[in-house]
Amino acid sequence: RRVVYVGAYGYENSRLMQNMSPSLGNNMSSSPAVYGMGGGDTEVLGRLKARFQSLAQLSSTMRMLVLDIEDSLNAQINTIIEHEKFQTLEARWMGLASVVWAKDYASNVKVKVLDLSWQELEHDLNYTSEIRKSLLFLRIGMQELDTLGGEPFGILMIDHELSMSLETDFDELYTAQLLCRLGETCMCPIIMGAGTAFFGESDAAWYTDTRRVTSVLGSGEYATWQRLRALPNAQYLGLAMPRTQLRGRYIDHDIGFLFNQTPAVSEGLWGSAGFDFIRTTISEYQRCGWCGF
């Protein structure tokens, strides 16, 4: 308590320095240096006078302590916000917030959030005998589309990047086929993201090279993908890519002290392009009452 309070800049700190000044004599019993400590003030001031030769030395030491505290806070916050799990959480909430803010300009649009992980979604769709018996159909189809007075969903976004990895519990491309059935049954298009390495390329430059795209997607590795695209109900599933930047790197960000995000090469926070697609859909619906263009 004493260290933190002595290291603070402000009214109490200035009075502490005044009481240490030789011009004020040795009467230090009324010093308010440590709030609520009563007679302990004299002991504190005595120890400070014994340790520091001048007010300038004390002030310099206090400033160094404050800088050390700020460096420690910077390091701790960077450790938190650079963690993969925290970035996923932050990106999800920032993306959702951008949709809610866009909705503010469209009073006839409702945004509903279902707290369901991708793993729970996979289990729900893969373990049910038919789509109409799944939890998702109950929430999206039966309770809204198939209920008198219900409010059918116009579009559903899943904040998950589709992957072709074989290390997952379920084949994600097969789960995507089940999502196509769900979208068709509920008459609700579904938007997802695609992983950065889904098409074997990590940069966005190749998207405009049609010959390269045709060569990649026509290879044997993407036979399952081609079968998915050939399904009649595949029109109910869309992938939005690449990822989009939600915020830049924090530089001299004022949060009570100046916070700088490291490493310096950090490009900030990136999230699913599905949120951008949803905002565009809301804007189009607000413009003409239809989101099919």
Residue map of PLM features:
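A glycine- and small-residue-enriched flexible loop/hinge signal that marks low-structured segments
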Residues: 2-54, 81, 101-104, 115-116, ...
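Glycine-rich oxoanion-binding loops at beta->alpha junctions
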Residues: 131-140
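Extended assembly-interface regions of large multimeric machines
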Residues: 52-56, 60-130
